[in-house]
Amino acid sequence: MSVIKMTDLDLAGKRVFIRADLNVPVKDGKVTSDARIRASLPTIELALKQGAKVMVTSHLGRPTEGEYNEEFSLLPVVNYLKDKLSNPVRLVKDYLDGVEVAEGELVVLENVRFNKGEKKDDEALSKKYAALCDVFVMDAFGTAHRAQASTHGIGKFADVACAGPLLAEELDALGKALKEPARPMVAIVGGSKVSTKLTVLDSLSKIADQLIVGGGIANTFVAAQGHNVGKSLYEADLVEEAKRLLTTCDIPVPTDVRVATEFSETATATLKSVNDIKDEEQILDLGDVSAQKLADILKNAKTILWNGPVGVFEFPNFRKGTEIVANAIADSDAFSIAGGGDTLAAIDLFGISDKISYISTGGGAFLEFVEGKVLPAVAMLEERAKK
């Protein structure tokens, strides 16, 4: 990969625009999992140390584009950064027509998704972003797979576009793991975003020796075996695709699950066979037998790719499946790479971050890179390096 790296540049006195991935979970105005901010801090600190005029921004959540919404403000991130940095930190809400930044100061530009045209990679918006800086630093691996104004468009028009240390490190680590992985290689795909990930399984089946599914994806496979999944999250229109995958790949489908009659933190968990799910019930976690079966598979792995929890681990009663799988990964001798927001939150919750070989800040980007797809932001950086 041939890109300009931020670490090769002299940033003293330069206006530096860092696109980080600060899309973290927030509850009651407080950051509940800081993994992505922690990962971005060294880049921010390096730019400040060099005497740059530093701006950093990110998306957070899914607000209606073009509208300010306090619920999705980066204010909780700013408060977190104020605690961690000795430099002054301030949040700027309106910045598209210019912003003054002092050397040694960190200015956080409000949620990029409040700007109309962000997601469509609007050229006029991209040029406004580019006009704010001398150097654009793309450091958000988590959004490198999206061609958007703050991740891709700005880079085409900024004087200099480079890869931040975190992005460069991510690409190197993932590249090494995928080039010649130690075998057997096990890929775990879980979480709630079903349709985006079911298509990924096809590609992964060609790379990995064993696929494991969890969460909403697993429910689609349970349905594909002819079981009633009640009110569970699953994709009815992808059941045929799941059936096809079951004939071509060895995918362990849950045989026992934890169900509830409501989706809430206080819902009662009932352990039962997948043969006995009622219409009013929904699957929220794996059962102990199914989770242990996955743990046994992971024990023998030499490379593990982990993207997504296997149950609604945010609810204490539906945490056990993900905990069993997480601990099996932590106890394994395999080279393990974990990615995705929910996965990072699970790693934090179970306190196993020091037992995972590499933690990627990317979710969708992580999966697309694993699939061998071109990431638009990376392609843009490679193009800019030629000029």
UniProtKB/Swiss-Prot annotation:
Pathway: Carbohydrate degradation; glycolysis; pyruvate from D-glyceraldehyde 3-phosphate: step 2/5
GO molecular function: ADP binding; ATP binding; phosphoglycerate kinase activity
GO cellular component labels: cytosol
Residues the entry annotates as binding substrate: 21-23, 36, 59-62, 113, 146
Any single Pfam family the record assigns to this protein: PGK
Reaction(s) the record says it catalyses: (2R)-3-phosphoglycerate + ATP = (2R)-3-phospho-glyceroyl phosphate + ADP
Chief location category: cytoplasm
Keyword terms, alphabetized: ATP-binding, Cytoplasm, Glycolysis, Kinase, Nucleotide-binding, Transferase
Assigned EC number: 2.7.2.3
Domain of life: Bacteria
GO BP, sorted A to Z: gluconeogenesis; glycolytic process
Cellular localization per UniProt: Cytoplasm
Enzyme class: transferase
Binding annotation for ATP: 197, 314, 340-343
Subunit relationships: Monomer.
Recorded family membership: Belongs to the phosphoglycerate kinase family.
Name of the protein in question: Phosphoglycerate kinase
Organism per entry: Enterobacter sp. (strain 638)
Lineage, opening ranks: Bacteria, Pseudomonadati, Pseudomonadota, Gammaproteobacteria, Enterobacterales
Gene designation: pgk
